[in-house]
Swiss-Prot record:
Main subcellular location of this protein, as a coarse class: membrane
Name of the coding gene: atpH
Coiled coil: none
Membrane topology: Peripheral membrane protein
Name under which the protein is recorded: ATP synthase subunit delta
Record HAMAP family: ATP_synth_delta_bact
A cellular-component GO term for this protein: proton-transporting ATP synthase complex
Organism: Acetivibrio thermocellus (strain ATCC 27405 / DSM 1237 / JCM 9322 / NBRC 103400 / NCIMB 10682 / NRRL B-4536 / VPI 7372)
Entry's Gene Ontology molecular function annotations: proton-transporting ATP synthase activity, rotational mechanism
Keyword presence, Ion transport: yes
Function according to Swiss-Prot or TrEMBL: F(1)F(0) ATP synthase produces ATP from ADP in the presence of a proton or sodium gradient. F-type ATPases consist of two structural domains, F(1) containing the extramembraneous catalytic core and F(0) containing the membrane proton channel, linked together by a central stalk and a peripheral stalk. During catalysis, ATP synthesis in the catalytic domain of F(1) is coupled via a rotary mechanism of the central stalk subunits to proton translocation.
Length: 178
C-alpha cells in the first residue's frame, strides 16, 4: 500500500513542481481532506465502486473545479479512475513528506515524558538541523509519561532513544547478558 501511495504522490509532486504550484497544492489537499472528513457521505460516494466512475468524477468537478488547482481536480479524478480513492489520506501524507524532503526540511517527532519549553524544542531542532544538514526542521511533540525522563527522537524509521526508560532497558539487557 505504501508503494502505491509513494508512486501517486511522486507523480503529483512532479507535476506541481513543473508548474511551480507545490505550496498551493499542499493547501488544496488540506482543504480536500477537511471536506472529506466533514462530509462522510460525499467521501463514501467517491469510494463506492457501485456508482459509475463518470458520476463520481462529475461530482468532483461540481464540488472542486474553480475552487482548487486544476492539477488537484485532475488528480482526484485519476484516483476515481484507478479505484484508488481509498488511498487519498496516505497519498497526501506522502506528498507532504516528499514536498518537505525536496525543500530540504527535516520532519521529526520529539517524544518526551513532560512538556518541553520552546527553548528546549528549538535546541533539539537546531541540533538535528545541523546534524542532517537541513534548511529547516518541523517537529511534533508527543508526551509519553512512561519514558520517566529524557526524550526519544524519531526521524523517519530511525529512533534515537535518550530516555530514562530506554537507558534502564539497555542496562537490563546488559545485566542479563552477563
Amino acid at each position: 500500500m505504501q508503494l502505491v501511495n509513494t508512486r501517486y504522490a511522486e507523480a503529483l509532486i512532479d507535476v506541481t513542481e513543473e508548474k511551480n504550484s507545490t505550496d498551493k497544492v499542499l493547501n488544496n489537499l488540506v482543504q480536500v481532506l477537511k471536506l472529506l472528513e466533514e462530509n462522510r457521505e460525499f467521501y463514501s460516494f467517491l469510494l463506492d465502486p457501485q456508482i459509475q466512475k463518470e458520476s463520481r468524477k462529475e461530482a468532483i468537478i461540481k464540488v472542486f473545479e474553480g475552487r482548487i488547482e486544476q492539477e488537484v481536480v485532475n488528480f482526484l479524478m485519476l484516483l476515481v479512475d484507478k479505484e484508488r480513492f481509498e488511498n487519498i489520506r496516505g497519498i497526501v501524507e506522502e506528498y507532504f513528506r516528499l514536498a518537505d524532503e525536496r525543500k530540504n526540511i527535516l520532519n521529526m517527532t520529539i517524544i518526551s515524558a513532560f512538556p518541553l519549553e520552546d527553548v528546549q524544542i528549538n535546541r533539539i531542532k537546531e541540533k538535528y538541523k545541523k546534524l542532517y544538514n537541513k534548511t529547516d526542521v518541523k517537529a511534533k511533540l508527543i508526551i509519553d509519561k512512561s519514558l520517566i525522563g529524557g526524550v526519544k527522537i524519531q526521524i523517519g524509521d530511525k529512533v534515537i532513544d535518550d530516555s530514562i526508560k530506554g537507558r534502564l532497558l539497555c542496562l537490563k539487557e546488559a545485566l542479563l547478558q552477563r
